[in-house]
Curated annotation (Swiss-Prot):
UniProt feature, compositional bias: Basic and acidic residues: 193-207, 235-244
Position of the signal peptide: none
Something else known: Present with 815 molecules/cell in log phase SD medium.
Native source organism of the sequence: Saccharomyces cerevisiae (strain ATCC 204508 / S288c)
Region feature (Disordered): 193-340
Protein name: Uncharacterized protein YML037C
Comp. bias intervals (Polar residues): 263-279, 307-328
Membrane-crossing residue ranges in chain numbering: none
An annotated GO cellular component: clathrin-coated vesicle
Length: 340
């Protein structure tokens, strides 16, 4: 409605009523009719567009703006917390892997440095960067040097001098990580490997060391010497026995095997004879000798009368071997005297 028409209606004498625009005409559909088709449509409409600060016919969008601002504040707070926390606590943030340029070989690193220097404009003097720890250490060492005598040299002064020399080199000296052998792919599983064990010394080295050892001055007093002497002594009689057995076998015309068997039989027989003689011979007391007064001619008759008990009967036949055989049991090796 125009403002002029409203004023004319108020000041005119005759009022002519007009058709109300709010009344629905045939075939027309209002906005509320559309909202009623949906469940809770009017409530949703009021929540989105209603506000107490409504000016004129302008629709309010404060709720939408407020929601957008709230989401923006949440995002800003999340970014602040991520940047403030350390790398170990950045669980929600993305993780990026990249190879360090220090791991590259020296030739590749030098080419990168030259291209960077040529392309970038000179920004004052190229001073080496000093870390905060080195700066704090230099300050503390300077204060300590004041307390120490100037003539005395401390380890801190030497270390600071070495650090200054390294900085003056201006990157000519390669870093410790430039030629390192430690390379790990971060995208693969890290496998722990054992360090190589020390090799055990071989037996040849031990024998060489034993040979190189000098014998002590009192080595003849040791136990090892007595053992070696006894072994040497025991070997000599065995060789002598073998020589004697060979000679006997050559004389008798028998083989060494037959000779040994024959000698063993003889030794067994000789032992049996000695045992039987000791058991069979009784102890006989000799009678006292008396002069019967007989003539010298009667002495012959006395020899003829021999008692029956004194008759000698050999228990076994005599052995055929001309010389007694020697057995190994008859030789006993000499043993050294024990120390007192």
């Amino acid at each position: 409605m125009d403002e002029n028409k409203i004023i004319d209606q108020l000041f005119s004498k005759e009022y002519t009523p007009q058709d109300d625009s709010e009344q629905a005409k045939n075939g027309d559909v209002s906005l509320y009719g559309l909202l009623d088709e949906v469940a809770n449509g009017r409530r949703l409409m009021n929540c989105l567009f209603h506000s107490p600060m409504q000016m004129g016919n302008k629709l309010s969008t404060d709720k939408l703006d407020g929601k957008c601002r709230q989401i923006q504040r949440d995002w800003i707070d999340e970014e602040k917390t991520i940047t403030m926390n350390s790398g170990a606590l950045q669980l929600d943030g993305p993780v990026l892997f990249s190879w360090s340029h220090n791991v590259a070989p020296t030739s590749h690193q030098e080419t990168i440095n030259t291209t960077f220097k040529q392309g970038s404009p000179s920004r004052g003097s190229n001073k080496p960067k000093i870390t905060t720890t080195s700066q704090l250490f230099d300050r503390a060492s300077a204060e300590i040097d004041k307390c120490i005598k100037p003539n005395s040299k401390s380890w801190m002064v030497e270390e600071r001098f070495e650090r200054n020399e390294a900085h003056t080199a201006d990157g000519k000296k390669p870093s410790t990580w430039a030629n390192s052998d430690f390379k790990v792919d971060p995208l693969q599983k890290f496998v722990v490997k054992e360090l190589p064990k020390e090799k055990k010394k071989s037996d040849g080295d031990k024998t060489k060391k034993n040979k190189s050892k000098r014998k002590s001055f009192f080595g003849f007093w040791g136990h090892s010497g007595s053992k070696s002497g006894s072994k040497k002594k025991s070997e000599k009689p065995i060789e002598a026995k073998n020589e004697i057995q060979d000679e006997v076998s050559q004389k008798s015309g028998l083989s060494p095997d037959d000779d040994t068997t024959f000698s063993d039989k003889n030794t067994i027989q000789s032992k049996q004879e000695s045992m039987s003689d000791q058991q069979a011979e009784p102890k006989v007391h000799e009678p006292a000798v008396t002069n019967t007064g007989c003539s010298e001619h009667d002495d012959g008759d006395g020899f003829e009368q021999v008692p029956a008990q004194s008759s000698y009967h050999p228990s076994s036949e005599p052995s055929i071997a001309s010389t007694p055989s020697l057995t190994l049991d008859s030789f006993i090796p000499l043993q050294p005297k024990k120390k007192i």
